[in-house]
């Protein structure tokens, strides 16, 4: 083959795009769009127009560079079929495998607690404000909803996997539709409140603190890290043998980039549309009421009384129902991951890695009791959801998504070629800023 043919062949490889690449682009995108998105407009809009514009600039770099770093770590293992746990064990030994198992479990379990609080508050808000029924006991509502989900999960897991997978796209479509439908209700309140002479960079309500806290909710909302390991394994098995690891890395990066663009476009449009239809004060009220933005929108349009349009009347009921479905979808998906993670920890520490010492049904029952029991307790206590995200959920995700890959890049020889890059500094900074929220929340 001539040098010209080699160049043409190389260009063909770089532009090579399969149907499976599109499928994974949409899969990563769909994984990230869940119940967490319903809280992003509240935190992003809480500080007004300037902070959310800064977040708009940061959104794509956070989504792309952080997930690409994790994908590169997954790609660094010798075994193309090895998942992230095997890869970390290869680089850092059995201790590294234990650490990654703990990180995965504690990155997902707090999300269940968050969703337990959210689904309880959303249901109670719908019950009282849309159905106009007497208030119910919080402990009873939380217990009923969790038992209902436990029964559905226990007896219809396979069916629910299919149903939840199907619901991803209607949920995304509903977010886009709501964003578009809110346009006639946009107002200039958020713009009118911008006073450049009164802007403060520092202080409790300053731009820097607002953006700093906003980074946590962005890490939480723009997150498809649970599926990155499976995604990389699939692409390595598909491309690496024929085209090599470098090509596979570029292919994974391109897919992650396109998924990030889709994700940022949908979520930021939804956030801006909510903010322009409401106001920063409304977002502060939503935070205080501890409900997702769709529930607040439903209550907001409900208060319009006789002046409601047909859309406002529809949204009053549809928004809460969409929120409930979204939360259940996210709860179910994260429950499976939490169950698997807790099962691995129990087998590893209680039975020294011997699966034969306990039946899977007994193990699943023990894990379910702990997961549902702890989720009910948190839902009953009703901590502020955004505070819980910023103090627990996002920092643990950041340690897995940002700091672990950066540590590996500086320690693992096969990742040495990625050292000294400016995007490494950015990813490390995002990870540290997110984790430092714990200190801010405590003090």
From Swiss-Prot:
Primary site of residence: membrane
Domain of life: Bacteria
Compartments in which it is found: Cell inner membrane
CC annotations in GO: plasma membrane
GO MF term list: L-serine transmembrane transporter activity; symporter activity; threonine efflux transmembrane transporter activity
UniProt xrefs under Gene3D superfamilies: Amino acid/polyamine transporter I (1.20.1740.10)
Transmembrane regions listed in the UniProt entry: 22-42, 44-64, 97-117, 135-155, 163-183, 207-227, 259-279, 319-339, 366-386, 389-409, 422-442
Reaction catalysed by this enzyme: L-threonine(in) + H(+)(in) = L-threonine(out) + H(+)(out); L-serine(in) + H(+)(in) = L-serine(out) + H(+)(out)
InterPro entries hit by this protein: Amino_acid_transport_2, Hydroxy_aa_transpt, Thr/Ser_transpt_TdcC
Membrane topology note: Multi-pass membrane protein
Keyword set, alphabetical order: Amino-acid transport, Cell inner membrane, Cell membrane, Membrane, Symport, Transmembrane, Transmembrane helix, Transport
Family statement drawn from the similarity comment of this UniProt entry: Belongs to the amino acid/polyamine transporter 2 family. SdaC/TdcC subfamily.
NCBIfam families to which the protein is assigned, alphabetical: PRK13629.1, stp
Function: Involved in the import of threonine and serine into the cell, with the concomitant import of a proton (symport system).
Name of the protein this chain belongs to: Threonine/serine transporter TdcC
Source organism (scientific name): Escherichia fergusonii (strain ATCC 35469 / DSM 13698 / CCUG 18766 / IAM 14443 / JCM 21226 / LMG 7866 / NBRC 102419 / NCTC 12128 / CDC 0568-73)
